[in-house]
Amino acid sequence: ASICNDVDVDAKGRLPDRPLEPMLSEMKAHGVTFSQDKPPFTMTGRLQGGNFSMVGDVSSQFFSGLLLAAPQIGLSTITSTTPLQSSDYVTLTTETMRDFGVEVEHTLPDTNINEAFTVPFGASFIGRDNYQIEGDWSNAAIWMVAAAMTGKPITITGMNKNSVQADRRIMQVMIDAGCDVVWDGMNVTV
């Protein structure tokens, strides 16, 4: 909706049952109309920049989506009116945006309420010739536990030891359980 006028959205399985509020309300308030409130629907209109305000305990994906759209729509501030769920994933989004030339100002009050992210007017993504996408700690955790249970070592490649992904904590769980965790660059063996 930030770069084109009409978008058809469909979903299968359990996806149509996922909550889309407060995202739909905020998009409606910023120039987008929907043929209905659940998929399948057609989004019409271009998303406009401005101040977005949503509860943070429904989905961090709403915040990531608006952050990624913000450079295309102008100055935008996105504020969470409740503590932000899965904030590590929003941090991953803002770090990736920084890697591609967009600095996001993050304001975190002491209460974790009214946490705000601002993308300045005129910000734009820059292309990169090479970029390594770090591995997914959620998926890696399953295999690390399997290695611990079977006693058969496994090496998982492309992992960032210092990732902001919450599931990286599995490393400490493995160590606390007595497993050997050995790093070699971006590869981890359990």
Where on the chain are the PLM-derived regions?
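Short, structured segments at the rim of ligand-binding sites
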Residues: 1-190
